[in-house]
Design a protein with these regions (language model features):
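N-terminal targeting or signal-anchor segments and their processing/structural boundaries
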Residues: 6-15, 27, 54, 161, ...
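Intrinsic disorder/low-complexity signature
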Residues: 15-18, 35, 127, 150, ...
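Extracellular beta-helix/beta-solenoid repeat scaffolds
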Residues: 57-202
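Boundary/junction segments of secreted and surface-exposed precursor proteins
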Residues: 5-56
Length: 229
């Protein structure tokens, strides 16, 4: 189906959090004292290609627990398989053109404040599947222009924005040749089950946001997605 620019929705009653019965965040579940064994985003691990060839014996599938302390640029096809990724505040992951970034059963989260999220360059691809969870992002996934997205069985929790399509600003000098495409968008959950980091009652702003673009989203026969307060 085709999704067009967002329309105003009636405001719902903000959720009331019970501090004594809040579910555990990914940080509480998976963040041990001290450092994770792998530190990405440093000078020698700034690019996915550095990780693949210098740390991972040429394999583009990485498994392990990661502290992402600086920006990670996905400059060649790269998969995080069953990884726990603890991300420093204000850090982002950027996927370059003509590259595929896959999250397969991985958990991405921030323990203080918020991380920026995953930025998709023109003609890039992101695949998320197998109970991947993305938490604590300003915008968990953002595609200002042409990108391909396959999102299945993924939980977006406690993000300010879950997925943003299009460009929130003046129309670019070069318009996008095609609009963002979801090849799959099924079985996902969007929720905010505890206050946003750094707040006592802050909640997600929007789950899927569309600006000044059209977007093709899945098929009518796809499994349902769940949107919760």
């Amino acid at each position: 189906m085709i999704s067009k620019a967002q329309t105003e929705c009636q405001e719902s009653t903000p959720p009331k959090f019970d501090p004594e019965h809040e579910p555990r965040t990914l940080c509480q579940k998976y963040s041990p004292p001290g450092k994770f064994p792998n530190r990405f985003g440093k000078t020698e691990t700034h690019f996915a290609s550095q990780i693949i060839w210098n740390l991972n014996n040429g394999s583009d599938v990485f498994t392990g627990d990661i502290d992402l302390v600086g920006e990670l640029i996905i400059d060649q096809d790269f998969t995080l398989l069953n990884c726990k990724v603890r991300i420093s505040p204000n850090v982002r992951i950027r996927v370059e053109a003509d590259v595929t970034f896959t999250l397969d059963g991985s958990k991405l989260f921030c323990c203080q404040d918020m991380w920026q999220g995953i930025d998709l360059d023109y003609r890039s691809t992101v695949i998320s599947r197998n109970i991947t969870e993305i938490e604590d992002a300003m915008v968990a996934m953002e595609s200002p222009c042409t990108a391909t997205m396959s999102i299945r069985n993924t939980t977006f929790n406690r993000n300010i924005v879950g997925i943003r399509l299009g460009y929130d600003g003046p129309v670019p000098w070069h318009p996008c040749p095609t609009f963002p495409v979801f090849t799959q968008f099924a079985g996902n959950t969007f929720q905010c089950n505890a206050p946003l980091n750094g707040t006592t009652n802050g909640v997600s702003f929007v789950d899927v946001q569309v600006y000044k673009t059209n977007a093709t989203i899945g098929a009518l026969t796809s499994a349902f997605n769940t949107f919760r307060n």
